[in-house]
Amino acid sequence: MKKLLKYLSPFAPDQSGVVSVLFGMGGMTVICDAGGCTGNICGFDEPRWATQKSAIFSAGLRDMDAILGSDDKLVAKIVKASHQIDADMIGIVGTVVPAVIATDLRALKIMTSKKVDIPVVSIEATGTKYYDDGEEETYMELFRTFLKADGDMEPEKTENEIGILGATCLDTSLLDFYTPLKKSLGQEYDKVYCYGLESDDGLSGIDVIKRAKNVSMNLVISPAGLKSAKYLKRKYNIPYKLGYPLLEKRIYDEIDDFLKGYEKGKILIIHQQVLANEVRNYIKNKLLEEKRDFLADNIVVGTFFQLHKELKEEGDILFKGEDEFREYVDKEDISLIIADKLLLRPIRGYKKAFIECTHFAISGKLVNDSNS
């Protein structure tokens, strides 16, 4: 019962993370469900669906299809749909139903590949994990598939190009995250590639993924991109760094105001781990400037999602549910919480300082929605 939610809405599941990465790939995404998971993704977890085009299909599994595992019928539907749209690839996405009946998605991928002339990938989402696990596996599948298909020749390295890993609406809470990323990084790098989306030299989708061999640096802006960054470092010797250049100026300003009177108590930052660490580093540097660095050990990062050991500091915490979160806040002497506003629901007894830092995967709110 640790994951029982009484005050919060369900967090975005892994299949939503998969679709979020595939959304801008210029392909055709097939969600293996009866329609409910697709409706949840398009209606709640993928805000671009309302304003941008992406070919997302439900497999439309009926009871007997699920029970009997009518793979041939599903493959025929995928092939027929692929002939009706101009897609660069096909992504087959698992959900709860195929996970329960042990559908072999790799077999579906192979069967489909034999009948179409475009690349096919499959991602084993189960609906039981969170969005960042789905994103992580999708990035890995895309790199494994398209870099391998591109051959094993020694890649031609460029001098000053950067790739972005882990940038989705679910992690950034922004509808358009490429424009501010380009603005932030364009002064330092000649070209900025956002994997799974676009670049400033006209490349998009698969072509951006293939470009991953050639960049001089990767920037990981959420934990979902860390595994792929390590893979690219190991296979192609591309260095990576972690950081989050998209934080609102308002948050920095509110932190500055709070620190003027800050004397004791913990500061709890709850978000995806890379963003939360960025906020913590900012606070630590401010305290160091003011010669109050003895307070730096009071800053704690908490998350409901991935908590990587190499990015973790002593005291950081993975909340397994809202009960653990509420108990932690009740037990600790906390002077400031920086988190999505929805997280105030389980801690109605908390009356101290709070700074809103929107997390779409938790509340379904975008940054501009929250501040309007």
Tell what function each PLM region has.
Residues M1-S372:
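An N-terminal assembly and electron-transfer interface module characteristic of large anaerobic redox
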